[in-house]
């Protein structure tokens, strides 16, 4: 159990029921009792926690500015950064196929795991505890975030960049949908006519998958 003791120190929370943490770390490819329900719960808690923090931190910002900052803080790449800080990839339980394809490094899987841990903390202790721990994780990010252009989501930023350069807009096509209706994984293929490449995004919703693909294109174009 030493490895989970180490993880609990990294996330600044000690579980009373360690099975909740184990479930939060279990991808659906590894077991029938996986982390997707916990992820659903954690996603809602995370969005509320960050929205509440931003509301009080920026009393003069309008709804649009607050929404963009929240989107930046709860999006997949940001959650994946937290996951890497906790080294979650070393603790996750993945099926053979996901392990072989490097699932422990995939941003979508890492981000989902962070949300699942938030959900697990709320069940193990309370909603208040989950909120407090989440705010602790986000302390530096909340301190550094500012209203501004870079808070727009990846799809919006990509569209504005292409329009500004009079380039054709991207197309997003669903290439694959896996899982039951309540816990699906979407694979989106994004093509920009002026780029000789196709980009793939994966997410727990079509929107998340499209945003992930757009983020890859922005990175390839070196657009911050």
From Swiss-Prot:
Residues 4-126 form the RNase III domain. GO terms for molecular function: double-stranded RNA binding; metal ion binding; ribonuclease III activity; rRNA binding. The keyword tRNA processing applies. Its EC number is 3.1.26.3. Pfam families: dsrm (PF00035), Ribonucleas_3_3 (PF14622). The active site is at residues 43, 115. Keywords: Cytoplasm, Endonuclease, Hydrolase, Magnesium, Metal-binding, mRNA processing, Nuclease, RNA-binding, rRNA processing, rRNA-binding, tRNA processing. It catalyses: Endonucleolytic cleavage to 5'-phosphomonoester. GO terms for cellular component: cytoplasm. It is found in: Cytoplasm. It is an enzyme of class 3 (hydrolase). NCBIfam families: RNaseIII. Belongs to the ribonuclease III family. Homodimer. This is Ribonuclease 3. The lineage of its organism: Bacteria, Pseudomonadati, Pseudomonadota, Gammaproteobacteria, Pasteurellales.
């Amino acid at each position: 159990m030493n490895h989970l003791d180490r993880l609990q120190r990294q996330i600044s929370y000690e579980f009373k029921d360690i099975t909740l943490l184990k479930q939060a770390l279990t991808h659906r490819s590894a077991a029938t009792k996986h982390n997707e329900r916990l992820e659903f719960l954690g996603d809602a808690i995370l969005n509320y926690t960050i929205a509440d923090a931003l509301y009080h931190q920026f009393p003069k910002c309008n709804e649009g500015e607050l929404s963009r900052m929240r989107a930046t803080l709860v999006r997949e790449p940001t959650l994946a950064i937290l996951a890497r800080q906790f080294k979650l990839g070393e603790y996750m339980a993945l099926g053979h196929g996901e392990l072989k394809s490097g699932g422990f490094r995939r941003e979508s899987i890492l981000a989902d795991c962070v949300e699942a841990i938030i959900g697990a903390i709320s069940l193990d202790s309370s909603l208040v505890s989950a909120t407090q721990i989440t705010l602790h994780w986000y302390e530096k990010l909340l301190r550094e975030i500012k209203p501004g252009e870079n808070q727009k989501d990846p799809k919006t930023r990509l569209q504005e960049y292409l329009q500004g350069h009079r380039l054709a807009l991207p197309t997003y096509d669903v290439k694959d949908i896996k899982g039951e209706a309540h816990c699906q994984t979407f694979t989106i293929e994004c093509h920009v006519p002026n780029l000789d490449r196709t980009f793939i995004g994966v997410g727990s919703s079509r929107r998340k998958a499209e945003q992930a693909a757009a983020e890859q294109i922005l990175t390839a174009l070196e657009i911050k």
